[in-house]
Amino acid sequence: MDAKNTTSRNGTAAPVHKHRGIRHLFAAASYSFGGAKRLIGEAAFRHELIAFAVAMVAFMIVGANLFQYVAMAILFLLMMAFEAINTAIEEIVDRVSPEISEMGRNAKDLGSFACLCLILANAAYALYVIFLARFLG
């Protein structure tokens, strides 16, 4: 396969259309929104989204400051990015190696572990802000 072609999911080759300038910006945004739409299809992401909403409500109740909201939002954006990467890893492994293999399982487990680390970081920070405000504020 040469640089001008790519293989679609059904195995057929289609030409790659490279956009330039402002059209490239809009195309890139379209791809990003497509990724976000795909990510919303993941149950784990929807659970993380609900947890973020609950944390934001809790932050309002305890009177968190702007810095704490921004830090929580940044942690959540990182978690979204890791969840997207993990989903991409899972899709690639499933496409390349539909049979169960140790390497494929390890790749999926490592991606899942990365997500778990960010979930724990988000939870720890949210609990820190909530309890710090409640007991020291």
Swiss-Prot record:
Catalytic activity: a 1,2-diacyl-sn-glycerol + ATP = a 1,2-diacyl-sn-glycero-3-phosphate + ADP + H(+)
Domain of life: Bacteria
Names of the cofactor(s): Mg(2+)
Gene Ontology CC, one term: plasma membrane
Gene Ontology MF, one: ATP binding
Membrane topology classification: Multi-pass membrane protein
Residue ranges crossing the lipid bilayer per the database entry: 45-63, 69-89, 113-133
Keyword Transmembrane: yes
EC supergroup of this enzyme: transferase
Any one GO biological process: phosphatidic acid biosynthetic process
Signal sequence residues: none
InterPro entries to which the protein is assigned, alphabetical: DAGK (IPR000829), DAGK_prok (IPR033718), DAGK_sf (IPR036945)
Record key words, sorted: ATP-binding, Cell inner membrane, Cell membrane, Kinase, Lipid biosynthesis, Lipid metabolism, Magnesium, Membrane, Metal-binding, Nucleotide-binding, Phospholipid biosynthesis, Phospholipid metabolism, Transferase, Transmembrane, Transmembrane helix
Subcellular location as annotated: Cell inner membrane
Family (UniProt): Belongs to the bacterial diacylglycerol kinase family.
Role according to the record: Catalyzes the ATP-dependent phosphorylation of sn-l,2-diacylglycerol (DAG) to phosphatidic acid. Involved in the recycling of diacylglycerol produced as a by-product during membrane-derived oligosaccharide (MDO) biosynthesis.
PANTHER family reported in the protein's UniProt record: DIACYLGLYCEROL KINASE
Protein name (Swiss-Prot/TrEMBL): Diacylglycerol kinase
GN (gene name): dgkA
